[in-house]
Design a protein with these regions (language model features):
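Short beta-strand element of the conserved SAM-dependent methyltransferase core
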Residues: 13, 55-57, 186-188
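Short, charged/polar micro-motifs that form catalytic or ligand-binding hotspots
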Residues: 14, 18
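Hydrophobic/aromatic-rich core segments of domains that either
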Residues: 19-90
Length: 207
């Protein structure tokens, strides 16, 4: 019984991404949006046990990766995530394995969700200004860092900003980082103390 239940759980995890990718394909077909399903292989050496499926869509003649399964893994009731909406190859393959079957090259990032929504920032000063607004309005801060590589040094600098601005209002910063995609989510809650940092794994369901 235990082994059967384990196999069922593994099948559920494996089939979830394929089902979601096929659902996106059906929805895009209904909306007249060109869309295909992309599939990557497992990689046991990295602890990735199963194949993974997502979508490639076409917007204004350009191709983009779309992975609703990864975004669903990261999303919570208070913050829906769009980290994997309209990514270029150089972005998606930071945390995706190579595709098994060839798909169109995705070289453009103009329609990346956070860029279109003006939530892709390039300077610490801009992050500080937006952090002040989020703390003042008691809102979640969710953004993409585009000011060069998100290194440990850059993250430390940003954490100082979150902590300083949160402490002004007697709050504490809870930070979640999608490191491969350089997306940062910050929640501000009442209470003093050091900020808490969580490194997210959008592919945790397949490991």
């Amino acid at each position: 019984l235990h082994s059967t239940s384990r196999r069922q759980r593994q099948m559920c995890i494996r089939d979830r991404c394929e089902g979601m990718a096929k659902a996106v394909k059906i929805l895009c077909d209904e909306l007249g949006i060109w869309c295909i399903v992309a599939l990557s292989d497992a990689n046991p050496d990295k602890g990735i046990k199963y194949r993974h499926a997502w979508n490639v869509i076409r917007i204004d003649g350009k191709y983009y990766h779309l992975d609703v399964t990864f975004d669903n893994t990261l999303s919570r009731d208070d913050a829906v995530r769009y980290d994997y909406v309209n990514l270029a190859d150089k972005q998606i393959f930071r945390d995706h394995e190579p595709v098994i079957w060839k798909v169109p090259e995705c070289t453009d990032s103009d329609h990346f969700y956070y860029r279109e929504k003006k939530l892709s920032w390039t300077t610490v000063d801009e992050v500080r200004n937006r952090t002040k607004q989020a703390v003042k309005k008691n809102r979640i801060l969710l953004f993409h860092w585009r000011g060069g590589y998100l290194t440990k040094e850059v993250l430390k600098e940003l954490l100082v900003v979150f902590d300083e601005e949160a402490s002004v209002k007697g709050k504490q910063a809870y930070v979640s980082v999608n490191w491969p995609q350089a997306v940062i989510c910050v929640r501000f809650e009442d209470g003093a103390g050091e900020e808490q940092v969580e490194m997210e794994d959008a592919n945790e369901g397949e490991r």
